[in-house]
From Swiss-Prot:
Residues 1-16 have a biased composition (Polar residues). It comes from Homo sapiens (Human). Residues 1-48 are annotated as: Disordered. The keyword Plastid does not apply. This is SPRY domain-containing SOCS box protein 2. Pathway: Protein modification; protein ubiquitination. PANTHER family: SPRY DOMAIN CONTAINING SOCS BOX PROTEIN, SPRY DOMAIN-CONTAINING SOCS BOX PROTEIN 2. It is found in: Cytoplasm; Cytoplasm, Cytosol. It comes from the Eukaryota. Substrate recognition component of a SCF-like ECS (Elongin BC-CUL2/5-SOCS-box protein) E3 ubiquitin-protein ligase complex which mediates the ubiquitination and subsequent proteasomal degradation of target proteins. Negatively regulates nitric oxide (NO) production and limits cellular toxicity in activated macrophages by mediating the ubiquitination and proteasomal degradation of NOS2. Acts as a bridge which links NOS2 with the ECS E3 ubiquitin ligase complex components ELOC and CUL5.
Length: 263
């Protein structure tokens, strides 16, 4: 068995699941992704911060995306508006393949991580204040200058995974892990030992005029759930994405059908 397939994940991008070990996703992630996404106001509250980015980056649409100005020999980063120290959080990064260049790094950072340097580099993950995945090279960076950085996910045959335009970042501050998912498949923890910090969504980029979007998908706190809530998760899991449209045909009261569909 390969990585964990997520309910609600897109299957448009195939992943070589047989190459990687069996890695279970964080508790509550499937539930988080099955729930209705936050509204536009919440998206902007969790979006890119125009006051916390490189001077070569312009944040647009209230934080929904940024554009990097075409400045030579500069690596530029941006941080999200909200930092997370508790709970499970997930957000989607959209970054066109043709706009990545030599160093396109996605991850998290503390408020102290630098957001600009005067050369091309994997800025995110270059010191102790940030953690990042170079989605072009497939390398993980933390306190790293590049050489010897581990590959992610760690394939058994040395094959590098092609990262599509959209990927999920999964930050579990209850367990202290950071991981990623693509094509509806969770790839496993990339980093551990993150408890006790406040971490912000972050990226660093080198491509002139690249546009990087962020879409916050929600939060789940570690707390007991009601039997009704757990029953809904069980029913949705057994139906699967392809059969959720058949809820209306189930022998259930209308109110229960609406509850199953988060309506």
């Amino acid at each position: 068995m390969g990585q964990t397939a997520l309910a609600g994940g897109s299957s448009s991008t195939p992943t070589p699941q047989a190459l990687y070990p069996d890695l279970s996703c964080p508790e509550g992630l499937e539930e988080l992704l099955s729930a209705p996404p936050p509204d536009l106001g919440a998206q902007r509250r969790h979006g890119w911060n125009p006051k916390d980015c490189s001077e070569n980056i312009e944040v647009k649409e209230g934080g929904l995306y940024f554009e990097r100005r075409p400045v030579a020999q500069s690596t530029d980063g941006a941080r999200g508006k909200r930092g997370y120290s508790r709970g499970l959080h997930a957000w989607e990064i959209s970054w066109p393949l043709e706009q990545r260049g030599t160093h396109a790094v996605v991850g998290v950072a503390t408020a102290l991580a630098p957001l600009q340097t005067d050369h091309y580099a994997a800025l995110l993950g270059s010191n102790s204040e940030s953690w990042g995945w170079d989605i072009g090279r497939g390398k993980l960076y933390h306190q790293s200058k590049g050489p010897g950085a581990p590959q992610y996910p760690a394939g058994t045959q040395g094959e590098q995974l092609e990262v599509p335009e959209r990927l999920l970042v999964v930050l579990d501050m209850e367990e202290g892990t950071l991981g990623y998912a693509i094509g509806g498949t969770y790839l496993g923890p990339a980093f551990r030992g993150l408890k006790g910090r406040t971490l912000y969504p972050a990226v660093s980029a080198v491509w002139g005029q690249c546009q990087v979007r962020i879409r916050y998908l929600g939060e789940r706190r570690a707390e007991p759930h009601s039997l009704l809530h757990l029953s809904r998760l069980c029913v949705r899991h057994n139906l699967g994405d392809t059969r959720l449209g058949q809820v209306s045909a189930l022998p259930l009261p209308p109110a229960m059908k609406r509850y199953l569909l988060y309506q």
